[in-house]
């Protein structure tokens, strides 16, 4: 699915901008590989917490895993740069009219939805609304959800556009 999204986003950019397309595509491929690696690492940390909990106590296991994750975070954060470029280049190209979509599609762009979905729990907390599990899930799945919103919007646009061209 991720590779399909990388190719689809890249295909949206006008052919005249080969350098931007190439950078965006390479960042996309790197993002797919790194995302799989990071998600596997996070799952491994969850497994360690589950495994260690009964053996050394839940609090000690959580402290050990959290300390390790905190120590690794500075090494992991730069790996998100290609993902920012993958979506950022597409966002800018859409904003300046260099894709096949009208600017109105910005309302469905992964950057917009990712920011919205990731911000909802923070906004709720600022409004002193009790944070619920669904808010955490929304925040943690924001990129995947944002990609799905874009794919649906792009499919609807393409269907309407094709019907309009057909007559």
Predicted regions and their residues:
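Hydrophobic, aromatic-enriched alpha-helical segments typical of multi-pass transmembrane helices
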Residues: 1-166
């Amino acid at each position: 699915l991720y590779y399909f999204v990388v190719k689809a986003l890249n295909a949206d950019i006008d052919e005249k901008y080969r350098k931007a397309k190439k950078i965006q595509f390479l960042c996309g491929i790197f993002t797919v590989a790194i995302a799989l690696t990071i998600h596997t690492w996070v799952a491994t940390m969850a497994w360690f917490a589950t495994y260690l909990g009964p053996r050394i106590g839940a609090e000690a296991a959580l402290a050990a895993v959290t300390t390790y994750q905190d120590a690794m975070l500075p090494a992991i954060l730069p790996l998100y740069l290609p993902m920012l470029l993958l979506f950022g280049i597409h966002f800018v190209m859409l904003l300046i009219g260099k894709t096949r979509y009208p600017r109105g599609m910005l309302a469905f762009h992964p950057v917009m939805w990712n920011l919205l979905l990731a911000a909802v729990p923070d906004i709720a907390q600022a409004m002193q609304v009790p944070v619920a599990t669904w808010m955490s899930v929304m925040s943690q799945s924001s990129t995947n959800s944002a990609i799905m919103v874009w794919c649906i919007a792009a499919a609807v646009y393409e269907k309407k556009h094709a019907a309009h061209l057909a007559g």
